[in-house]
Amino acid sequence: MTVDLIPVARTPEGGWTGAFPEPVLAGCHAPLVDGAPDMRGVWQVTEVLVDGRPILEHPALGSIQRIEQCADRVTITAGGIIHDMRCDGTVEHGVNDVAEFDKQTPISVVATFEEHVHVLRPVGLPIEVKRWRDGDDLMWQYVGFTCRLVRLGPASMQPG
């Protein structure tokens, strides 16, 4: 199945709770596009850095993300949201969903792959969110902090 045949997933009203929703791209087996980091899997934050220094208490510590990929498409399921995007540099195919912090504020985010880095640029905000591989680990740079994540298993596994 191709990415074009799989409907775009959206965060349910109010966000999802409890068990992770079923994977979105499970039936898609197209190879990743050139320049895409392989982020597929279920990941857990094990370290948070602020200004290069480890922070021992942070809301992101221990959090879990499921990342699915197929061709230029990425879904990130975490914290009650499902962000489904094509990494083609357009608003139309980027994340058009709700923010994680309240599960109701609409967001539009342009997604790209740039030299093996997944880059998210929220429309109207001067920030970038990045994900890239560092050996076996995944790095996630958000506003004000950077996280190291370890892979718990394939994207098909049910976290928890």
Where are these regions (language model features)?
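Short, basic/low-complexity N-terminal boundary segments at the transition from targeting/disordered tails
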Residues: 39-54, 86-94, 99, 107-118
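N-terminal glycine/threonine-rich, aromatic-flanked beta-hairpin/loop signature
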Residues: 5, 54-104, 143
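Amphipathic/hydrophobic helical signal segments and adjacent flexible N-terminal regions
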Residues: 1-73, 154-160
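Acidic, glycine-rich flexible loop segments
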Residues: 105-129, 133
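A structural detector for short beta-strand units
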Residues: 63-65, 81-83, 107-109, 126-130, ...
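Surface loops and adjacent helix of pleckstrin homology
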Residues: 48, 79-81, 88, 123-124, ...
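Beta-strand-connecting loop/turn residues
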Residues: 70-74, 116-118, 136-137
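Short, exposed beta-strand-loop hairpins at the edges of beta-sheets
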Residues: 137-144
